Amino acid sequence: SSAASDVYKRQIVLLVVLFPANIFAQERRDKEQTYVLENPYEVNKITPLQGKKIKNVVLMIGDGMSLMHVYSAWTANRGKLFLDNCQAVGLSKTYCANKLITDSGAGGTAIATGQKTNYHSVGVDVEGRPLKSLVDFAVGKDKSAGIAVTCRLWDATPADFCCHNKDRDAEAEIVADYVNSNVDYVFGGGAKLFENREDGRDLFKELRDKGFQTPRSWDELVKIKSGKVFAGPYPV
């Protein structure tokens, strides 16, 4: 019948469309998918000093890094990583107060303050109230505290330790909080939001007025041996 013929034609067309995909999928399965690090780097084993009080604590955050990322690197480097020398490792449950999937704002706030907060929030609780971070607790115990990042300073992860805002996208507002934070040393990018601002503020000048040195290049930074430092050499 005509109807049966139409169905048959549709089936033929469907097979023509799908069959090549099955072939390609088989080719992908048959092809070996491997990565080989030809020159793995050496990892020195560091033995912790026994009986001595720890002076410095470094918190390393691989933003978005999961156990699988670490395991992949460990496997590629023949079962050795400098991370193996870390004496303490922590895990964060990656959900925020109002969403199942977090972002760097809420996720970083949990690490920095020990409290869950809303999606996109930076250093504030679910009501928008500022939270004390590890930086504040360190200074409260007469310790110095600093942050050094490979991103812009208004990015949520570094901002979680020094700034307070309900919206991580309020970048100009966020960087202004560094002026009144308790941090002693800062290194990161994003200098363009510290000067030539729409509100007319020069945040580098305000930081200098508070006793910070504000080197704008790597050469200037390495010459500084003491004192409070706010280094923003990268304008991006």
Per-segment meaning from a language model:
Residues 1-8:
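Short, small-residue-biased leader/transition segments that mark boundaries at the very start
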Residues 26-197, 203-221, 228:
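N-terminal catalytic scaffold of extracellular/periplasmic and nuclease hydrolases
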Residues 226-236:
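Acidic/His-rich catalytic or pseudo-catalytic neighborhoods
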